[in-house]
Amino acid sequence: MLQYLEPRTDVPAKDDWSTGLILQDLRWGATTLGGIAVVTGAFGVGCLFLAKTPGNVGAISVLFLVTFLFGLGPLMCWVETKALRRGLLEQPWRRVPATVAEKQDDDLHDLLLLGDGTVLKGWFEDLPDMVLERQEVFVCGPDASGRAVVRGAGFAKMENAKAGKNAETHPARERVERPLGRPLDDAATMKAYKGMRWGVRSWLWSAVPAGLGGVLVLLSLFPLAPAGLVVGGLMTALGLLGLPTAIEISRWYRDAVKAVENSAQWTPVAITLFPWKPNQNVAGLAQMPGGLALVQFVIPDLNVVANIADTGVMWIAGTHGDVIAVGVPRVPVLTFAAVQPDRDTPKEDPIPWIQRFHQPDFSGLPR
């Protein structure tokens, strides 16, 4: 059986390092994105008192759109930390035999059938396939109100659940053996690969705001709209400043996509991660097929890095030049890393500012 990230079952769940990493990442997102949402929202409200010229109206629209989108970060944190507020994470994770119920046409929820007869329902996204594969799940709860939280092996994510009834009325899905073949033969990896293909267009995240900012500036020239000039100017400046990095990231994604497409198999390699520092790339020393090499993750994924930290194994989904695609078999995650065979220590080089807004907080990784 493949080794995956698993939470510790001998300490309270909140003291498990991987659970702490999940909570830390949620708080970081809420703090960073929430702070931006508050600032843009305050400016948007202030702009409501200005003359309703095309430029000012455009600025107000942009500010409130940013407020809405970035405000989703604190909302997600509030939803996904319910288990902590309810005290469910005060108890250890329990490894419980489990399977998955067949989903009927009228079912709005996924159903997990635990070995003790408990039924847990919720929106579990990709978790059921891993539960079906390993025939187990990690659970805290249910509490007196029937609330629980679950995790699956390999996932650096918690899912809220609620206890249901009548386990005998829910037929279980049949477990099917899935040999480990080409990465793209795996449905979960294929899902992640489709997302990675969108990364090839990462340059649009800078080019589009820069272009829209330029349009807003033009609209604000006549009649003169101070808010439009300021907001449009900031959008254009930030977009142009981030464009070189965005183009470089697009190139990394393009090479990673080629690596996955040309790969005939998963390649597991041993790796030791270096202690992480804020605003630095996640890096490690890996025993690559050609020898020891420094591996630096340009866009680190929380699931991938947590699995590496727990198991000491990095799963390579393909190689293209000095770029490797890295994932976790049967988990819908893919990222990429740069391989430097001539180095054995990471260079002290801060990551570009544009990447700091979406880099997870890895300070909770075990040392």
Label for each model-derived stretch:
Residues 1-29, 133, 154-201:
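Cytosolic juxtamembrane N-terminal segments of multi-pass membrane proteins
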Residues 1-2, 245-252, 256-258, 353, ...:
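A eukaryote-biased signal for long
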Residues 7-22, 261-278, 298, 339-347:
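Cytosolic/matrix-facing juxtamembrane and C-terminal tails of multi-pass cellular membrane proteins
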Residues 14-87, 187-259:
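Alpha-helical transmembrane spans
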Residues 88-106, 260-280:
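Structural detector for short beta-strands of small beta-barrel domains
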Residues 105-113, 278-287:
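Short aromatic-glycine-enriched beta-strand elements
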Residues 118-124, 292-298:
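A short macromolecule-binding patch
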Residues 126-184, 302-367:
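A membrane-cytosol interface segment of integral membrane proteins
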